[in-house]
Amino acid sequence: MLSILPLAYSNFSRILQYFEQLPVVDKMTEEILKQGVGIVETSLTFEPPFCESFERISIDNFPIFALGKEISKEDGIEAMKKYVTSRFWFTYRRDFSPIGGTGPSTDQGWGCMLRCAQMLLGEVLLRRHIGRHFEWDIEKTSEIYEKILQMFFDEKDALYSIHQIAQMGVTEGKEVSKWFGPNTAAQVMKKLTIFDDWSNIAVHVALDNILVKEDAITMATSYPSEDAVKLIMENGLVDKNRLSLSPGNIIPEWRPLLLMIPLRLGLTTINPCYLSAIQEFFKIPQCVGIIGGRPNHALYFVGMSGSKLFYLDPHYCRPKTESTAKMYAEKDSTATTDDVGFSHLEELVPLPSQTADVYTKMDDSTYHCQMMLWIEYENVDPSLALAMFCETRDEFENLCETLQKTTLPASQPPMFEFLQRRPKYLPKFEPYTGVSMKIEMKEFDDIGAANVKIDDDFEVLDVHTEEEDADEDNDDDVANA
């Protein structure tokens, strides 16, 4: 067994296949066979995805605050476990369609921050469409819940899939399969939400440790321009179901705002002076967590008790979940196989739970973690991003007041600077409203047609020698005479 240890970092799936061929001779082999690649990774890399289980946690400091929810000693640790389990848990997956057609078919080893971004965004969508502090019921789900979950499936046509996030990262200078930092993840979320008409969320990323209230308001009241790039389906057509969000299309003045604040709270280790401020942050009703982790080991932080931060860990690899849309199409002989691009996000695809006479409930158990994990504050990487979600303008005003009166004064120096207006020394704030560069392919449809002279649309430049120019001048003189 020790002879295969050097292979651990290169190919976990081969190790798993090796063990599957062995008889169960001891407890460790049995555990590996049960947990698969995840346990092999845990045992051999010393970066266990589950460093502490619920049963081993001793909580001395109550109340616990999780994403703005207070859990008292009377509620007990079980209430916290249930709350953590109700959050979306997106982890490494394997065997999905190659990203970009020829790219990786698993995100194991590089996609942890992308998965944390998915978990954060999943929490935002739950609040947007269902409400705060969603409680998951393993026996029952709603259509809205399933629609949200579909948006994160590991498929190229799911809006918040690993495929879309990885490819959008290229616009931020990150090649596919390269590790993201918190700021890159925030920027990618800002760009992807532009295409989510259903949620209509604005994302503001505050840079340089400065939150300017005026800028956040501008972002929340801006809409993608009419000439912004539209989603292009694989057949080359613009998806007509997903037109731009313009003031003429949407009446409300305020778009629900996801506020992201990337920070670096120390050089190589997190500064102890910010502990109280982080504790206060998790008390804020608008808190939707922190994406950060350990160096090159991203985690999604959802709560805090004393110096312990509770988190969801994406470092657990599973096979790709079978698409419920594909399951339905295979069973329904009338289902079309045409590529519909992103339109299925607007027109809900029938899911198993909605066709109970034929199907059983969709198995979403792998998207919810049954264990509660924690890390000491001192072990957290100083590079992280705070996230807050304001459904209404009133919630945003309340958040600003809380930040100024409670959260920021809790540490000296404060975690970041809060300003009412943009300083004159900073360039003008330009809200991101999509890329204003839409090419109409029909303009090129007539190229090559028999009745089209391409040269007619261009100025023809002839190159003459000096002798030819002189001859032409003489000819002109003769003609004029």
From Swiss-Prot:
Domain of life assignment: Eukaryota
EC number: 3.4.22.-
Any single biological process term in GO: aggrephagy
Alphabetized GO MF terms: cysteine-type endopeptidase activity; protein-phosphatidylethanolamide deconjugating activity
Positions of region (Disordered): 462-481
Keyword hit for Iron-sulfur: no
Localization annotation: Cytoplasm
Alphabetic keyword roster: Autophagy, Cytoplasm, Hydrolase, Protease, Protein transport, Thiol protease, Transport
Active site location: 112, 313, 315
Catalytic activity, reaction form: [protein]-C-terminal L-amino acid-glycyl-phosphatidylethanolamide + H2O = [protein]-C-terminal L-amino acid-glycine + a 1,2-diacyl-sn-glycero-3-phosphoethanolamine
Record-stated family: Belongs to the peptidase C54 family.
Function of the molecule: Cysteine protease required for autophagy. Cleaves the C-terminal amino acid of ATG8 family proteins lgg-1, to reveal a C-terminal glycine. Exposure of the glycine at the C-terminus is essential for ATG8 proteins conjugation to phosphatidylethanolamine (PE) and insertion to membranes, which is necessary for autophagy. Its cleavage activity is functionally redundant to atg-4.2, but it cleaves lgg-1 precursors more efficiently than atg-4.2.
Protein name according to UniProt: Cysteine protease atg-4.1
Encoding gene, per UniProt annotation: atg-4.1
